[in-house]
Amino acid sequence: MKNYCGIITLFLAIISATGVFCVDFPNKGGKCDRKECRKTCKKLNYRGKCFPNYCRCFPG
């Protein structure tokens, strides 16, 4: 089962106080690319961390 967290979680992150959300990488066969993850999160001034099949962005 695919882990869909993209847009919905992004909106939840904006609303929520924690601001932690994750990003899907459908083009990489579900694998998280560390470089892409960090680049994506950096655009929003977040830190990116890879998990097996998604990228999670943390504030700071």
Swiss-Prot record:
GO cellular component, one term: extracellular region
Keywords assigned: Amidation, Disulfide bond, Ion channel impairing toxin, Neurotoxin, Potassium channel impairing toxin, Secreted, Signal, Toxin, Voltage-gated potassium channel impairing toxin
Site (Aromatic residue of the functional dyad): F58
Annotated localization: Secreted
Entry keyword annotation includes Secreted: yes
Cysteine pairings via disulfide bonds: C32-C50, C37-C55, C41-C57
Similarity section: Belongs to the short scorpion toxin superfamily. Potassium channel inhibitor family.
Protein name as annotated: Potassium channel toxin MeuTXKalpha3
Taxonomic source organism: Mesobuthus eupeus (Lesser Asian scorpion)
